Amino acid sequence: MMKKIAVAILSLMLLSGCSLFSDEEKEMKQTIPEITLKSSPNTEIKATRSGFTWLGATTKAYLPTPQEFFKDEKLVRVSKTDQIRVVTENKVRMGLFKKVDLDSMQLALVLDSGEFEQVALTERDDGRWEFSVPQKSGKYMYVLDEGYQNGDYEVSYYFGVEISE
């Protein structure tokens, strides 16, 4: 009798999407953006997760200042005329049966003062996103925010580039 009750409870949990085997880290790995140069699609720009709201858990990881970031990171060199492409999953699998949709993506430039300046992202027909780099040479740090399921799931990443002459 107890076995039947246990099997029934586990079955209900699986069917309702409350899988005992749900793995937040595995689910969030699906959100890691692929960031490349339009002129050189094989050149990847590394993004680091800085925080998330996932399945009711909220974590704000350390977001370095631009000065700390530039000191510690090796940046990809980019031409002033290049564009950067961002590719993310439009649907993320949650547990065994549920998928959540990407419904917002925002990009901000992190200024030396620590303030954020919104950057226009353009969505292309093939599902990729693009943005143009600043015309002034220098090192730039960005924060990318992805929102899924009307903001129930959010993940932030930071990355940087160096604009050359």
Please provide the spans of the model-predicted regions:
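Surface-exposed, short loops/turns at beta-strand junctions within beta-sandwich domains
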Residues: D125, S132-K139
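Extracellular Ig-like/FN3 beta-sandwich strand-entry sites
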Residues: T81-Q83, S137-M141
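Positively charged n-region of N-terminal signal peptides that target proteins for export
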Residues: M1-I5
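Mature extracytoplasmic domains of secretory-pathway proteins
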Residues: T53-F116
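Short beta-strand segments within Ig-like beta-sandwich modules, predominantly Fibronectin type-III
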Residues: V119-D125
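C-terminal motif of bacterial Sec signal peptides marking the signal peptidase cleavage site
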Residues: S16-G17
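Transition segment at domain starts
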Residues: E25-K74
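Short acidic/polar inter-strand loop motif in beta-rich domains
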Residues: Y148-S156
